[in-house]
Structures are given as C-alpha cells and as structure tokens.
Amino acid sequence: AWSDTAEPARLFPSAAAIADAGADAIARCGITPARARSVIALARAVASGNLVLEPGVDVDATLDRLRALPGVGPWTAHYIAMRALRWPDAFLANDLIVLRAMNETRAARAEAASAAWRPWRAYAVMHLWKGAST
C-alpha cells in the first residue's frame, strides 16, 4: 500500500503519496482516467498546502478552491465540505436522491427550498439519503 502510517483496520496513503503515484496508478484501482486526474489534482493541492481540508477553515474559500480543480463541481465540493470540513450547512442541491426526495427537478429550486434548514442542511441531506435507502 501507499501509506506511511496505519491505524487499526485503516491504511490510507498520504496526499503526497497519491500525488506522486500518478493518474495511471490511481486508474488501476478502478477509477476512470478523468476521475483519476481529479484525484491527483486534489492530492497535489492538499500536499502543497494550497488546500486545507480540516474543520475550521474558511468554507467559502475552500469551496472556491475545490471547484477550481479539474472535475470538481458543486456536488463534489459540498460533499467534501460535509465530510472533511464537517460543515453542517453543506447542501448537495443537484444530488438526484435529494431532488427526488424534495419532489424537485431543478437544483436552484431545491437550494431555495433548503434555506429553511440552514445552518443544518447537511443533516437534512443525510436524512434524505437514509430515507431513500429504506
């Protein structure tokens, strides 16, 4: 594996190791070449310190940096904010399950309707996902 450290039941490479691995190595893990290039770009940004993915960072600036990466759109940026930044107001407005659960077809309308859930929209997203899986 590519990791410098291991935890019980967990072994994951550092951002620098992923960045150095190259897109071909990432693609061999079953990831499409385009996504592999996105993963490499993200890893390089994190390894260089240009992108910090930790709770407490400026969320808006981090979302902007994420969306500037190749292959990273609003869904991916908000998902990373929800998980890595632990941002409770992340909202995946163009998520198919979210749109269906909200009986919406347009992300802009889902975004507007979600205003009532601020600042806890990430919890609403998880609730909608959970409801769809049962």
Positions of PLM-derived features:
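HhH-family (HhH-GPD) DNA N-glycosylase catalytic core used in base-excision repair
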Residues: 1-134
